[in-house]
Amino acid sequence: MGPALAHLDIDQQRFAWIPEDDFVNHFAADLDPVKARVMFAVQQPLPWSALGEVMGVPAWKSLPTWFLVADGDQAIPPAAQRQFAPRMGATTVEVSTNHVAMVSHPDEVLRLIKTGAEAVAAAT
């Protein structure tokens, strides 16, 4: 895990929360700080167990896959993302962004989603 997740607050119900400083400066580092603070204020916790549980058979084993590598991600290291994508056989794009690419680079994310949707539609 990267610095965005280095200081998680785990509550009594075993939910993980990202502290404000880490959220603004690492998790959503390429956003305007005001927008990042709004996102921090409305964040939903992640069950702590989710970071270590095996979730069953991954869909990428049987379905076409597209993957966006966020080369400035401070939550999931970009090197790990670059390793995951080929293992999945994913069509991959790399964007200079942080973990919240869907907010900071919505056009690039939309383009990747459209590419995947069009490829699947053409194959059926």
Predicted regions and their residues:
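Active-site nucleophile elbow and catalytic-triad environment of alpha/beta-hydrolase enzymes
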Residues: 38-59
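Short beta-strand/loop motif that positions the catalytic acidic residue
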Residues: 61, 66-69
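Conserved loop-alpha-helix segment in the C-terminal half of the alpha/beta-hydrolase fold
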Residues: 71-97, 103, 115-116
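Short, amphipathic alpha-helical "lid/cap" segments that border enzyme active or binding sites
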Residues: 106-114
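Flexible "cap/lid" loop of the alpha/beta hydrolase fold
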Residues: 1-20, 47-50, 54, 76, ...
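Short, hydrophobic alpha-helical segments
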Residues: 113-124
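Helix-loop "lid/cap" segments that line or gate small-molecule binding pockets
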Residues: 20-30
